[in-house]
Amino acid sequence: MKEFIVLSEEVKAGQAKGLPIVALESTIISHGMPYPQNVQTAREVEQIIRDNGAVPATIALIDGKIKIGLSDEELEMFGNAQGVAKASRRDLGYLLATKKLGATTVAATMICAELAGIEIFVTGGIGGVHRGAETTMDVSADLEELAQTNVAVICAGAKSILDIGLTLEYLETKGVPVVGYGTDELPAFYTRQSGFDVNFQLDTPEEIAEMLSAKWQLGLKGGAVIANPIPEAEALEHGFITNIIEKALVEAEENGIQGKNVTPFLLGKVKELTEGKSLDANIALVKNNAVVGAKIAVAFNQLH
């Protein structure tokens, strides 16, 4: 296994000193945002993690290796490269064997983080159960990963284009705690509201670190969703986003868009109808998650 994992100099030095490390995914760079905002955001997020006392480790697949921590040049390459594969659990073996470029999803980043001994991972939002999943079976592999891999995911909830109710049902079945950081309502990515409750509200990084520590000491496999609402100033109105999604769903149906094609269509509509506000919101929430994630990593590190 070790032959596949390559730590960056910064991560190697951090681990040797016993510093807290925070994992970051790379699909947000390759697939989540346009260039050059993607690379700029990735660099800023890494810096926020450093400023809050932890070491950033952006994870990606390059040349048959799992890179834990990317150089500036590698970040730039991911931001610009064409045809980067989106890597989830099923793709890791193939992409390493064929030495293709792979950007890691939430699921794959969790796997790689656990292999590298990293427990805390910051991202934008998690995947979930898609609308209409009762017929399409379209459920993100992120949820299954949360059920079996010991990594906490700090995120701004799940995107409202998903079926949030079913996503929570699935996580409940799998025994994955959904924790609200300073909130009793699950945030829905661009918006602070979803109309659904979290399982527990915790208000400090220390409390979250203690919960994670107790969970894993009991040998309870699986991660946790730490839902951190987008900052008020950048949040989009819950009603506004819901309205856009309802309209887009009708349009999708009228145009015969089905199954796997619905999500990209909805995302495109949200982007178009928010007039780019969704990109600003996306950047703001990831940065906010980086602050919280770094603080949780510091607190968790102090317990161990």
Curated annotation (Swiss-Prot):
Active-site residues annotated for this sequence: 25, 159
Originating species: Lysinibacillus sphaericus (strain C3-41)
Quaternary structure and partners: Homotrimer.
Binding site for Mn(2+): 138
Function: Catalyzes the reversible cleavage of pseudouridine 5'-phosphate (PsiMP) to ribose 5-phosphate and uracil. Functions biologically in the cleavage direction, as part of a pseudouridine degradation pathway.
Pfam family, one: Indigoidine_A
EC identifiers of the protein: 4.2.1.70
Secretion signal span: none
Annotated family: Belongs to the pseudouridine-5'-phosphate glycosidase family.
Residues involved in substrate binding: 86, 106, 140-142
Highest taxon above the source species: Bacteria
Keywords tagged on the record: Glycosidase, Hydrolase, Lyase, Manganese, Metal-binding
GO BP annotations, alphabetical order: nucleobase catabolic process
Cofactor: Mn(2+)
GO molecular function: hydrolase activity, acting on glycosyl bonds; metal ion binding; pseudouridylate synthase activity
GO cellular component, one term: cytoplasm
Cofactor binding summary note: Binds 1 Mn(2+) ion per subunit.
Protein name: Pseudouridine-5'-phosphate glycosidase
Catalytic activity: D-ribose 5-phosphate + uracil = psi-UMP + H2O
Alphabetical list of InterPro entries matching this protein: Indigdn_synthA-like, PsuG
